[in-house]
């Protein structure tokens, strides 16, 4: 009961909110954009906007709209066709959002991003500045992944993850992911009729992945992906709420303090802007496999990664590149800027600090990755 009350207070106190709306809530059973549904969303968004909330909208639906415009009955599987559908459908998607929000005297702006945009330091900072200006001007950014120029992101990426990255970028108070599911259950409700809806969970609880299920046809983000997104947002100190967009006036009810769906809470402090940029790297130049002692030192004691804790070096990278650190089961532990090239890292892996000096000389850094240049998962 205390957790529910705390969750209600937490929701009511949120000012800057990233709202992600999935394809199934914006399309008419996959038959293109549903103008009535989008108009209804616009009304709720306008209510929050007029109440003083700062809304950043992450909207899916471009590929589904493109399919209808090209009279396709099934989602293409080849990359060029998917990219073409996204390009065609994005025209309709942004026009629809602009039109319905303009009726509420709200100005919108289209922002198309890829993971590469967020991984490049300069482009990341530029997009941060642009989003900040839009928010200050009381303009609602309508953000989507730039599927037309994406490569593997269009097959493996998703707007849940993009929304979590944006939440970190803009220092959001809350990420809301609206879907066709009620929230997070303790088991898959499609196979277990006795599955229970979880009201509040800790975003960093590893057990959540065991409870998550799959996704729908037009959308790409199943519950596993949403849990990962909630964890990514949590690293920036941002809680996530996953709720059913099919509930009446769900946004208005949530922001009035009604706790619907599942709140993924976080006890983590906000990480620095540099660490947020590091955390945005879903793809890295290489990776370091580290032992249990190094995992404990990084996650529990917030220490730097030393060569002695590195068991294996994978990929080709240069000094200053961003690499990921994984445990010996392959689970990502952290990402960070490495102080050695892959060639040097291979030479010094597993060596104690005094041995590193003997091999590479006194002038070189002792840390494989310094804690100030690391984002922990």
Curated annotation (Swiss-Prot):
Annotated positions binding ATP: 20, 179-180
E.C. code: 2.7.2.11
Catalytic activity of the protein: L-glutamate + ATP = L-glutamyl 5-phosphate + ADP
SMART domains per the UniProt record, alphabetical: PUA (SM00359)
Name under which the protein is recorded: Glutamate 5-kinase
Organism field: Acinetobacter baylyi (strain ATCC 33305 / BD413 / ADP1)
NCBIfam families referenced in this protein's UniProt entry, alphabetically: proB (TIGR01027)
Signal peptide, first to last residue: none
